[in-house]
A protein has these predicted regions:
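Generic structural signal for well-ordered alpha-helical scaffold segments
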Residues: 37-44, 127, 131-139
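Acidic, low-complexity terminal tails and accessory targeting/binding regions
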Residues: 1-3, 39, 45, 76, ...
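Active-site-proximal alpha-helix that buttresses catalytic centers in soluble enzyme cores
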Residues: 2-4, 8-73, 77
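Short glycine/proline- and acidic residue-enriched helix-loop micro-motifs
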Residues: 104-125
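Short beta-strand scaffold positions
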Residues: 54-55, 128, 149-150
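Amphipathic, non-transmembrane alpha-helical scaffold segments
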Residues: 29, 33, 57, 98, ...
């Protein structure tokens, strides 16, 4: 059995008001830095990870670095963990997108599995990428604990895959900043032990 600890990066500017950050490389805020430190402590106290994989964006690298300092695990950047490519929507607020692409914005919330972002990706593209990371973990880290630091969208997609749920259920899973999800990966099945656990952040 391989244990997967799935973490979303800490708080960044651009969460409020809601906007499509995508691949814009924004650093952790001061709150996000504290999130990362608390998450690192929680992981170090509970598990002994042997490897940490992160998205190539700075907010995930910063979060992964905090976990590495606390656990002494090695960190590797994985391009396939990059955030969803929102194309023309990137860095626009939800209000801006709704005003300009009202029908597609409505579809994104009603049927996300049917959307391809203008000059960007679809959820199917995202799942194909994060699945590569999952296969690598299963191949190279049998009977180990591995941390993956990713983004809201990628983490949701990965959890849906592990839960054997369709992409139409995208909005039924949530991923808060520095939330932890724990998954046991067995040879023929996976067991999701917790999703979006944030008890370690109550002091922030």
């Amino acid at each position: 059995m391989t244990r997967l600890i799935l973490v979303r990066h800490g708080h960044v500017e651009g969460i409020h008001p809601p906007r499509f950050r995508g691949r814009r490389d924004v650093a952790l805020s001061q709150t996000g830095i504290r999130h990362a430190e608390l998450t690192a402590g929680r992981i170090a106290r509970t598990w002994r990870p042997t490897a940490i994989y992160t998205s190539p964006l700075g907010r995930c690298i910063q979060t992964g670095a905090a976990i590495a300092r606390a656990t002494s695990a090695c960190t590797k950047v994985m391009e396939d963990l990059n955030d969803l490519h929102y194309g023309d929507w990137e860095w626009r607020t939800h209000a801006e997108v709704q005003a300009r692409w009202s029908d597609l914005f409505e579809c994104w919330h009603a049927a996300p599995h049917l959307v391809r972002f203008p000059h960007g990706e679809s959820l199917q593209d995202l799942v194909a990428r994060v699945s590569n990371v999952l296969r690598l973990i299963l191949d190279q880290h049998q009977k180990e604990t591995v941390v993956v630091v990713g983004h809201d969208s990628g983490n949701r997609a990965l959890l849906l895959q592990l839960l054997d749920q369709p992409l139409s259920a995208y909005w039924r899973v949530t991923q808060d900043p520095c939330a932890i999800s724990e998954v046991e990966l067995h040879a023929r099945a996976s067991v999701v032990r917790c999703i979006n656990e944030t008890q370690h952040l109550v002091s922030v």
